[in-house]
């Protein structure tokens, strides 16, 4: 490898030799971009080597990388080490690497806990896991520490382990098939959905039991366990609300099925685009639908061209746009980052203004009214959908009949407004009264529902305007 910088120490060259390349890309095409990436990687490794030389942990890092052994020791750096790099703070969105964004609460720390190397920031363990193990890594949500890691990121210690072999990739749990009675009737009329569009939804603030991004966001648990956003907080929520949770349901322990029926397994399959996003201003749809293929994407207010990981609203035009909408659009800023990791969907507020989310799946988990709107403050993160919880509800609903399954269609739609909220506590009482909002359709669950409904056939009792 040719020297990119004036001098590259031998240990840096050795460590860079173990760098994983993304999809084996290289050669012609994108040469300038690849060159910039190589230069950035070299700077990131140099910065780490310089720090580890002071603590004597450099040999352990090299041992872990060359042997690819998880039984090596922790390789730690200060968890608030932004000051180490001594580089300027980026001024524009193009200079930021928001992947794995992480912010400490202003009350607890003044530094944001991320490393900054040549105008790009990221969580230290994410940076080096991406460098030496998984080039396609998007977020810390995709990682969980091994059991014997004493300084894992989630432990929130003063030192954080950056040994890439002390972390594992979170696997997406396999959802069990739903057993549906074989049906031959052709569906000719769908029952009406419960419609909360024109009712005034309740409001709630960011759940007290869910810690903001300044604290540990739990790792996605192994298959078979439906996670919540904090063990103690869930207990408090369940005690105070005294309501059932999808986490308590299991497709294998629901009410018994009549096995004399001819049951057909209907399996879940992952679509090419996990969600579709439509943007609205007041009650008017603006622009084309965005189809999300990547597990991490941002919806922001900037004017850069959209790509597979970014839906930019700034370029969208609307001849009917009024002054309120214009002002709101200016405050969207960095917007929201959406993650689809391990069968769970997270929404993280990157904007300086709050976002407001209406997620029936999330509301059901906490025992709230299905139409409740939750305010997510800047720097905070909320799980807004859980595939395993949805699978349990679907299996239960099949036993309750066609209409119960069809009602789950609403759970697959999530509405989210920027800057301005709506509901009983706000001047705007419907989402179509908010200046700027988006609607997410979760394609995997929707397609699963469609297959189940097709298998079930038509409802036993026709629903009409007279019923």
Curated annotation (Swiss-Prot):
Alphabetic keyword roster: Acetylation, Cytoplasm, DNA-binding, Metal-binding, Nucleus, Phosphoprotein, Transcription, Transcription regulation, Ubl conjugation, Zinc
Phosphothreonine modification, residue list: 8, 220
Residue numbers carrying N-acetylserine: 2
Renumbered ranges of motif PY-motif: 221-225
Sequence segments annotated as region (Disordered): 207-251
MH1 domain sequence ranges: 10-176
Subunit comment: Monomer; in the absence of TGF-beta. Heterodimer; in the presence of TGF-beta. Forms a heterodimer with co-SMAD, SMAD4, in the nucleus to form the transactivation complex SMAD2/SMAD4. Found in a complex with SMAD3 and TRIM33 upon addition of TGF-beta. Identified in a complex that contains at least ZNF451, SMAD2, SMAD3 and SMAD4. Interacts (via the MH2 domain) with ZFYVE9; may form trimers with the SMAD4 co-SMAD. Interacts with TAZ/WWRT1. Interacts with FOXH1. Interacts with SNW1. Interacts with CREB-binding protein (CBP) and EP300. Interacts with SNON. Interacts with ALK4/ACVR1B.
Gene encoding the protein: SMAD2
Positions where N6-acetyllysine occurs in the chain: 19
GO BP: activin receptor signaling pathway; anatomical structure morphogenesis; cell differentiation; odontoblast differentiation; positive regulation of transcription by RNA polymerase II; SMAD protein signal transduction; transforming growth factor beta receptor signaling pathway
GO molecular function: DNA-binding transcription factor activity, RNA polymerase II-specific; I-SMAD binding; metal ion binding; RNA polymerase II cis-regulatory region sequence-specific DNA binding
Protein name: Mothers against decapentaplegic homolog 2
An annotated GO cellular component: nucleus
Sites of Phosphoserine modification: 240, 245, 250, 255, 458, 460, 464-465, 467
Record's keyword annotation contains DNA damage: no
CDD domains recorded: MH1_SMAD_2_3 (cd10491), MH2_SMAD_2_3 (cd10985)
């Amino acid at each position: 490898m040719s020297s990119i910088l004036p001098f590259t120490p031998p240990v840096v060259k050795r460590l860079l030799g173990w760098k994983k390349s993304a999809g084996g890309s290289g050669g012609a095409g994108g040469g300038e971009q690849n060159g910039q990436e190589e230069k950035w990687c070299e700077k990131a490794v140099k910065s780490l080597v310089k720090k580890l030389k002071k603590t004597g942990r450099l040999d352990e890092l090299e041992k872990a990388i060359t042997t690819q052994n998880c039984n090596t020791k922790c390789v730690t750096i200060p968890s608030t080490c932004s000051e180490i790099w001594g580089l300027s703070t980026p001024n524009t969105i193009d200079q930021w690497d928001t992947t794995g964004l992480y912010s400490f609460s202003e009350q607890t720390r003044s530094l944001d806990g991320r490393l900054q190397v040549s105008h790009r920031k990221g969580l230290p363990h994410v940076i080096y896991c991406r460098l030496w193990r998984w080039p396609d890594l998007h977020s810390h949500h995709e990682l969980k520490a091994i059991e014997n890691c004493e300084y894992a990121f989630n432990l929130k210690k003063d030192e954080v382990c950056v040994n890439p072999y002390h972390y594992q990739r979170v696997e997406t749990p396999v959802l069990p098939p739903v057993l549906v009675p074989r049906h031959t009737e052709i569906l000719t009329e769908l029952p009406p959905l419960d419609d909360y569009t024109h009712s005034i939804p309740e409001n709630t603030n960011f759940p007290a039991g869910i810690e903001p991004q300044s604290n540990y966001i739990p790792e996605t648990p192994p298959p078979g366990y439906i996670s919540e956003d904090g063990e103690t907080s869930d207990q408090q929520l369940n005690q105070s609300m005294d309501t059932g949770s999808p986490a308590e349901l299991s497709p294998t322990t629901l009410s018994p099925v009549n096995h004399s029926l001819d049951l057909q397994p209907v399996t879940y399959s992952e679509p090419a685009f996990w969600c579709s996003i439509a943007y609205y201003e007041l009650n008017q749809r603006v622009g084309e639908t965005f189809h999300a293929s990547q597990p991490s994407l941002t919806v922001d207010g900037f004017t850069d061209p959209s790509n597979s990981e970014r839906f930019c609203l700034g370029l969208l035009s609307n001849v009917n746009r009024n002054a309120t909408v214009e002002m709101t659009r200016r405050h969207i800023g960095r917007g929201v980052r959406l993650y689809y990791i391990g069968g769970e969907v997270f929404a993280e507020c990157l904007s300086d203004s709050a976002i407001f989310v209406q997620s029936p799946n999330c509301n059901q988990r906490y025992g709230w009214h299905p139409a409740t709107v939750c305010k997510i403050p800047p720097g905070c993160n909320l799980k807004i959908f859980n595939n395993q919880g949805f699978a349990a509800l679907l299996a239960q609903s099949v036993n309750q009949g066609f209409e119960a399954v069809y009602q789950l269609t609403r759970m697959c739609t999530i509405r989210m407004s920027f800057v301005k909220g709506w509901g009983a506590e706000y001047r705007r009482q419907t989402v179509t009264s908010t200046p700027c909002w988006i609607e997410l359709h979760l394609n995997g669950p929707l397609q699963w529902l469609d297959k189940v409904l097709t298998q079930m056939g038509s409802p036993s009792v026709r629903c009409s305007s007279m019923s």
